Design a protein with these regions (language model features):
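Acidic/His- and Gly-rich active-site-bordering loop/insert found
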Residues: 3-115
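Acidic, glycine-rich active-site loops and adjacent beta-strand->loop/helix elements
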Residues: 81-85, 121-129, 134, 139-140
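Short helix-loop-beta-strand segments that form the rim/entrance of peptidase-like active sites
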Residues: 108-128
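Glycine-rich phosphate-binding loop signature in dinucleotide/nucleotide-binding domains
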Residues: 142-144
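Conserved small/polar residues in nucleotide/adenosyl-binding loops
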Residues: 146-148
Length: 148
């Protein structure tokens, strides 16, 4: 079976639960640096797939990371989850976060075959809060070949 087919088949299995994650986030928006319930929810979801979630991390109370694979170039997928004041997830972070999680989980079973590592990086305060800058300054992107 090709990598593409294997990836797609696994995402098909995850489809319902990923939609549930997106819906939950949409219904429970939290502002920059206040994403306590959202980060806890996402961490609990990810623990089903790997118990090695680091939370909190990088000097941010609502940041997390989980890495799949042991060797090879590191791909970092940012999971953004803050909302905007008064309009919630009009920016679509519920969808962006879910897509990043889906991509990371889809690659989880392929990391050894592809010779890579994949890190899902919980990225709070993206909407004007400078969360990515804080993550960068605290080493979250060190050794990454690609960060998306």
């Amino acid at each position: 079976m090709s990598f593409k087919v294997e990836f797609k088949n696994y995402l098909d299995e995850l489809h319902k639960s990923l939609c549930d994650v997106s819906d939950w986030m949409y219904e429970n928006p939290e502002l920059s640096f206040e994403e306590f319930e959202t980060s806890k929810y996402l961490v609990e979801y990810l623990k089903k797939y790997n118990s090695d979630v680091v939370y909190p991390t990088h000097n941010l109370d609502t940041a997390f990371e989980i890495t799949f694979g042991k060797d090879g170039p590191l791909v970092v997928l940012c999971v953004e989850y803050d909302a905007l004041p008064e309009i919630g997830h009009a920016c679509g972070h519920n969808i962006i976060a879910t897509c990043s999680i889906g991509a990371g989980l889809g690659l989880r079973n392929l990391v050894d075959k592809l010779g890579i590592r994949v890190k899902l990086l919980g990225t709070p305060a993206e909407e004007g809060g400078g969360g990515k800058i804080i993550l960068l300054e605290n080493g979250a992107f060190e050794l990454s070949l690609i960060h998306i």
